[in-house]
Curated annotation (Swiss-Prot):
Domain of life: Bacteria
InterPro entries: UppP
GO biological process: cell wall organization; peptidoglycan biosynthetic process; peptidoglycan metabolic process; regulation of cell shape; response to antibiotic
Note: Bacitracin is thought to be involved in the inhibition of peptidoglycan synthesis by sequestering undecaprenyl diphosphate, thereby reducing the pool of lipid carrier available.
Name of the protein in question: Undecaprenyl-diphosphatase
Length: 257
């Protein structure tokens, strides 16, 4: 029962923070440092990523279907936009893996996320659409996504800000952000599977508990994603800065003691 409760806690955090601009990686690192080895299971990481990936596929299935049928140029934009995260992600994972588990860095980057959200709230609305985005602009949005490899930097907040700076309107900046998330989450899942195979252990968590975790992450993710879309249309995403900055300051202060 204790393991089930811990998995459900992680699934809820993953489902909320994967989509709302508050950084799932940062919160999981901080939560793991508070509660011990809560977030260290590679198998659980794969399962929770699969749950939130399912949320994206459900919410954006019409856009994804359109990409496969007629908007194939956008697939090229997504490939270009994914390259920075691949290069930087592999570099950090292989050369500096310790920073991905640093609660101090996660706290500091939560503050940066809060500042980015404040900047986002001050931008003048534009009318660009993601299907008209240039290759260079897609690459730059991808650089914003690569920045979010650091724990505490929100992937959604960073890429939505990048899209808005490239001239996208509110809806399309959100849509492009989460279309970019599909290869990013798939890539993270593949790396996690690779680590799992090299480690040779799937952990002690039962299939039933893992299934519940995936279902919780999936359901919470759908709610969080729809919440983000609604608040983006209402220009409220900067409100999350009031969580990120105080939380980040608190984590930094606690880890500097």
């Amino acid at each position: 029962m204790q393991e089930l409760i811990r998995v459900v806690i992680l699934a809820i955090v993953q489902g909320i923070a994967e989509f709302l601009p508050i950084s799932s990686s940062g919160h999981l690192v901080i939560l793991g440092s508070m509660l011990g080895e809560l977030g260290e299971s590679v198998t659980l990481e794969i399962i929770l990523h699969a749950g939130t990936l399912g949320s994206i596929l459900v919410v954006f299935w019409q856009r994804i279907w359109a990409l496969l049928l007629k908007d194939r140029r956008v697939i090229g934009l997504l490939v270009i936009g994914t390259l920075p995260a691949v290069v930087i992600g592999l570099t950090i994972k292989t050369q500096f893996p310790e920073i991905l588990r640093s609660p101090l860095l996660a706290g500091a980057m939560l503050i940066v996320t809060g500042v980015m959200l404040i900047v986002l709230g001050r931008l003048t609305p534009k009318s660009g659409t993601y299907d008209r985005l240039g290759l260079g602009a897609a690459f730059l949005v991808g650089c914003f996504q690569a920045f979010a490899i650091l724990p505490g930097i929100s992937r959604s907040g960073s890429t939505i800000l990048g899209g808005r700076l490239m001239g996208l309107d509110r809806d399309d900046s959100v849509t492009f952000s989460f279309l970019l998330a599909i290869p990013a989450i798939l890539g993270a899942t593949v790396l996690a599977i690779k680590d799992l195979l090299e480690d040779g252990s799937s952990g002690e968590t039962s299939i039933e508990v893992l299934s519940i975790g995936a279902a919780v992450a999936f359901a919470v993710g759908i709610v969080a994603l729809k919440w983000l879309i609604r608040w983006s249309r209402e220009d409220r995403l900067h409100w999350f800065a009031y969580w990120c900055i105080p939380a980040g300051l608190l984590v930094v202060l606690l880890n500097l003691r």
